């Protein structure tokens, strides 16, 4: 039996990188997309996957461009001859108060964080057979909570669960499942960016409101995504699963 193949966008760091390593440990080959302007070295993901005993091909990708996304899926087929899973993880995060919001900032955010998910799933589905699985990474910012000075980000992330629910129904006759993951506060390079996100101090402060007493790790989100693409979740589709250490169910003090 041929090993399965997963396509991951935003695989150079954070959740995407952790997922690539998790897949490697379970024998799944990885085709990862990375944004060329991203400061993180994509070779680091390749090295970690190889250390875990897996195979990974990292290719440049702009999820804001349909041709780029289509090319990634086609290259996955050329390299491995099949595509079983697709995880839309790539995302943009920038702080922008409403009164400073420009149409360009708004459009860029939705183009990457929402339309980019659609592009990824559209490209992957063209090559998937029955038993395929799609997972999109949303956020509690928009998916559950609001977030001041990030209305464009929250709007995009709020749209992801709706997209996944609709695609779950549409793609079910093809034997393809589609789910969303809604992470809470997870320590990643993106969340550690104090200019556009919480930063180290903000994360430490926020952790005090989390019932489990800490922020999450990228590998913990990766484990959930891996479950959602596995046969262990074969009857699960159209769902949006929050992974936040209990933050969104805590009663106010």
Regions found by a protein language model. Name each.
Residues 12-13:
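Conserved glycine-rich cofactor-binding loop
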Residues 139:
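Residue(s) in the substrate-gating loop at a strand-loop-helix junction
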Residues 144, 226, 237-253:
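Short C-terminal tail/terminal secondary-structure segment
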Residues 28-43:
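Conserved glycine-rich Rossmann-like NAD(P)H-binding loop of the short-chain dehydrogenase/reductase
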